[in-house]
């Protein structure tokens, strides 16, 4: 029975360490890993005849905060549906820091995200997680990446801080830089989308295009 209980708990974003003892006991203790992989990658497949990737880029939705704009997120989905766009790149801080006061209590913020982030069966979100998104892990030991991977398959997490999306022979980096973060993947791509800054700009930098 303990394995079933542990699996149920792990599905909600918690992890456990197995401690083995010479008397044959196995003791399970909560494990908080702050050094979660900073970089990950995923392959976004396209047909051979399709030469153009159409996507929308968003960032810093801070769901659960007093200033959240779920209406604009719904507008984004409606725009994608009307234009036949099936991919959204989300550059992090999808939720607000659970230590911050907000319209939703801190312990309910992750469930609020799961229930209120829009869904359409034809739209995928590729998400790099930011400094606000790591707050459930730091405060409760609850990994948002695990939760989204288990309960929202349309919200594809590709790492904390940065992640790499391979598209045919090219690579796209989503980045949300913060202090406890080492940037490596952005050296592998000509296109980098940044979150965290809360303003829009385009910059050419050493043959890279940064947004």
Segments from the language model and where they lie:
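Active-site glycine-centered loops adjacent to acidic/histidine catalytic or metal-binding residues
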Residues: 60, 92-93, 130, 176, ...
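Core catalytic region of metal-dependent phosphoesterases/phosphodiesterases
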Residues: 41-43, 63-157
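Acidic, histidine-bearing metal-coordination/catalytic regions of metal-dependent phosphoesterases
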Residues: 1-57
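Residue-level marker for buried hydrophobic side chains located in beta-strands
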Residues: 55-57, 87-90, 127, 173, ...
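Beta-strand-turn-beta hairpins that frame and shape the catalytic cleft
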Residues: 44-56, 164-173, 206-208
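Flexible, charged surface loops at secondary-structure boundaries
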Residues: 48-51, 80-84, 119-122, 166-167, ...
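Short acidic low-complexity segments
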Residues: 156-166
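Conserved beta-sheet core of the metallophosphoesterase superfamily
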Residues: 1, 171-211
């Amino acid at each position: 029975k303990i394995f079933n209980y542990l699996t149920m708990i792990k599905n909600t974003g918690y992890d456990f360490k197995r401690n083995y003892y010479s008397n044959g006991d196995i003791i399970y203790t909560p494990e908080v890993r702050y050094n979660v992989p900073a970089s990950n990658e995923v392959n976004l497949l396209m047909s051979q005849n399709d030469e153009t990737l159409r996507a929308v880029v968003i960032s810093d939705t801070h769901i659960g905060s007093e200033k959240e704009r779920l209406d604009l997120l719904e507008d984004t989905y409606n725009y994608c549906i009307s234009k036949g766009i099936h991919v959204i790149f989300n550059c992090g801080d999808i939720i607000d820091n659970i230590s911050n006061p907000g319209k939703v209590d801190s312990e309910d913020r992750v469930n609020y995200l799961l229930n209120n982030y829009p869904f359409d069966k034809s739209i995928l979100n590729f998400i790099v997680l930011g400094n606000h998104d790591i707050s459930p892990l730091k405060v409760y030991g609850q990994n948002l990446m695990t939760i989204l991977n288990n309960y929202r398959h349309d919200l594809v997490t590709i790492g904390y801080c940065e992640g790499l999306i391979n598209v045919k022979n090219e690579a796209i980096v989503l980045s949300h830089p913060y202090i406890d973060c080492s940037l490596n993947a952005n050296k592998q791509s000509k296109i980098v989308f940044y979150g965290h800054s809360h303003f829009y700009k385009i910059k050419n930098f050493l043959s890279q295009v940064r947004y």
